[in-house]
Each structure stands twice: as structure tokens, then as C-alpha cells.
A protein has these predicted regions:
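Conserved ABC transporter NBD signature motif
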Residues: 56-69
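Catalytic Walker B motif of ABC-type/P-loop ATPase nucleotide-binding domains
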Residues: 151-154
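Conserved ABC ATPase "signature" region
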Residues: 93, 97, 104-122
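Helical segment within the ABC ATPase nucleotide-binding domain
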Residues: 166-178
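Conserved ABC ATPase signature
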Residues: 126-130
Length: 196
């Protein structure tokens, strides 16, 4: 269980997050909806300890989140961060290994993931050759292949057509059904109501 208690973040006089309280439980999805500047990404960055809260606490099973816990977090940032010169396979294996998955295990799962998310192309294709939608699906695979217990998805459907949005939603629901705690942000209320 992830718990945010009285979480706030100020940047000078600007209040980005104000007294946020929430509990995320295994097998549940929580969707955050709001305009740009509403504090969604700031909340994710505080959970990940990229930025420090002004006040409040974030706990995993009633204790502070540790470095070991971070190995169990899958994160899809809003700013896509794939290395353009790497192949799809190199990219995904790199992220899987960063999260403690063996290269052999990641490699054996790769074809299955590419098929399930309907990525057009081969594992040996360079990331720079991918369409925006396929690049987003590859980044999603990199965030999920190691089977994280806690998944943070910042605007996972941004720029996707309805078919690819549906594919990504199905994958999020599959991970939820396997017991992952999932939080995501969206500008679209329909996306939030469909999977939360």
C-alpha cells in the first residue's frame, strides 16, 4: 500500500500540491485528472523522490520508500525518454536490467510484449525509426516488462489514436488484475473513468 499524507509542494509563492491525501492499494488503479499545472506530475515526482515535498509523508506499507522499493516501480514519464540510436531490444533490455531483471529473462519476454502491445517493426529496429505511437508503446514496455508492483504513468495516452489508447488501457487493466498498484494522469475524463 502506498500512502500520501498531507502532501504539499510549494515553489516560492506558488502552491503546486496542497494537502494531498490518498491511498493506493494492490490491484487498484487511480486516475488523476486536471489541467496543465494542476500538480499531477509534481505529485509523481514527489513519490519518486525526484523532488522533495514541502510537507507531508509518502510511505510504502507504512514505512518510507527505500531504494530497494524503487526497483519495484515502473514509471512512464510524460517527457518520453527513449535513446533514439538504440534498437527496441537494447532499449527495453537496458531498462529491465536497471530494475533488477536478468537480461536473459527480459529477452525471453520481449517478443511476447511487442506482440501484445502491437508494436509495428522488429526488435532490431532503431527507436528513431518508430512512429510516436510505437515509441510510446516501447516506453510502456520498458516501464512494465520487469513486472513492477507499483506503476506510475504520466499522461500515458497523450497523442495516441483510439486504437493504441485501447491497447494501452488493456495492458494497464491486465497489470491491475495481476495485483499492481497503478496511478496515472490524464486530461481526458473518459480515460480515467474507463480504467479507474
Amino acid at each position: 500500500m502506498i500512502q500520501l499524507t498531507h502532501l504539499s509542494k510549494r515553489f516560492g509563492d506558488k502552491i503546486a500540491v496542497n494537502d494531498l491525501n490518498m491511498i493506493l492499494e494492490p490491484g487498484k488503479v487511480m486516475g488523476l485528472i486536471g489541467q496543465n499545472g494542476a500538480g499531477k506530475t509534481t505529485t509523481f515526482r514527489m513519490i519518486l523522490n525526484f523532488i522533495v515535498p514541502t510537507s507531508g509523508t509518502i510511505t510504502w506499507d507504512n514505512r518510507p520508500i527505500t531504494q530497494k522499493d524503487k526497483q519495484k516501480i515502473g514509471f512512464l514519464p510524460e517527457e518520453r525518454g527513449l535513446y533514439q540510436k538504440l534498437t527496441i531490444e537494447e532499449q527495453i533490455l537496458y531498462f529491465a536490467e536497471l530494475h533488477g531483471m536478468s537480461r536473459a529473462d527480459a529477452k525471453s519476454e520481449l517478443t511476447h510484449w511487442l506482440k501484445r502491445l502491437d508494436v509495428v517493426g522488429k526488435a532490431s529496429d532503431k527507436v528513431q525509426s518508430l512512429s510516436k505511437g510505437n515509441a510510446q508503446k516501447v516506453q510502456m514496455i520498458a516501464s512494465l516488462i520487469f513486472k513492477p508492483e507499483f506503476i506510475i504513468l504520466d499522461e500515458p495516452f497523450s497523442g495516441l489514436d483510439p486504437v493504441n489508447t485501447s491497447i494501452m488501457m488493456s495492458e494497464i487493466m491486465r497489470m491491475r488484475d495481476q495485483g499492481a498498484m497503478i496511478i496515472f494522469s490524464s486530461h481526458d475524463m473518459n480515460n480515467v473513468t474507463k480504467i479507474s
